[in-house]
Every structure is written in C-alpha cells, then in structure tokens.
Amino acid sequence: MTFEMLYSKIHRATVSDANLNYVGSITIDEDLMKAANLRVGQKVDIVNINNGERFQTYIIKGKAGSKDMCLNGAAARKVEIGDKIIVIAYATFSEAELENYKPTVVLVDDKNNIELITHELEGGKYV
C-alpha cells in the first residue's frame, strides 16, 4: 500500500508579483526551492490564505535571492500582490518509508526571507 503525504511546503509566503500574460505556473526564488526540496516542473498546490482559493500549478525557478513568489498565467487571477500563500508539495510513500517520514516545512517572513526550516509537524503549529 502507498500513501500520498505532505512532502514539503513553504508556509505564509507573500505574493511578490502576478503576471497574467505569462504561460502559467509559479515562479519561486531558487533559494526557497532548495530549502523546501522543490524542483522545476513539480506540481504544487497553492492555498491563498487571504481569499481561500486553492489550485494546482507547477514550479518555475526564480533568481536566487530575489524572494520571488510570482503567480503566472491564469493563476495570477487567483491572487493579489501581498497575499499570503502556502505552497504545498506531496509525494507517495510506501508504508515502510513512513517509519522515517519527516516532511520539510519552510517558514518565511513577510518579505519571503527564511525564518525556520523544520521537519516536525507539532499539533498544528506548522501545518
């Protein structure tokens, strides 16, 4: 049996731009991608904390150090610059792999600077 589980997330990131005329996706600062173990082209869920929107897209790598969190294409209509979002990636694990399961949670400040990287899910504290 396999289980689809939280793999990684960037929590409470601030939308820095919304580019309606781009093909699609979310552009994420390369440093944030590395911290969250995310990859170019990876499917992610986006949850907009401000308006409750939830949708899927894929990742494009942004410039390291840019603090980019830019929704592109149709997804740009689901956010406003300054909105808080959660970027969530899932992965499939076998029952045996779950014995050592530890997702990556990246907490950022209002300017998308990394505040904390943790692998613990403590009673709703980071989820």
Swiss-Prot record:
Heterooctamer of four alpha and four beta subunits. PANTHER family: ASPARTATE 1-DECARBOXYLASE (PTHR21012:SF0). One of its GO terms (molecular function) is aspartate 1-decarboxylase activity. Its main location: cytoplasm. The modification Pyruvic acid (Ser) is found at residue 25. Substrate binds at residues 57, 73-75. It comes from the Bacteria. Binds 1 pyruvoyl group covalently per subunit. Catalyzes the pyruvoyl-dependent decarboxylation of aspartate to produce beta-alanine. Its EC number is 4.1.1.11. The active site is at 25 (schiff-base intermediate with substrate), 58 (proton donor). Belongs to the PanD family. One of its GO terms (biological process) is pantothenate biosynthetic process. This is Aspartate 1-decarboxylase. Its cofactor is pyruvate. GO terms for cellular component: cytosol. It is an enzyme of class 4 (lyase). It comes from Aliarcobacter butzleri (strain RM4018). It catalyses: L-aspartate + H(+) = beta-alanine + CO2.
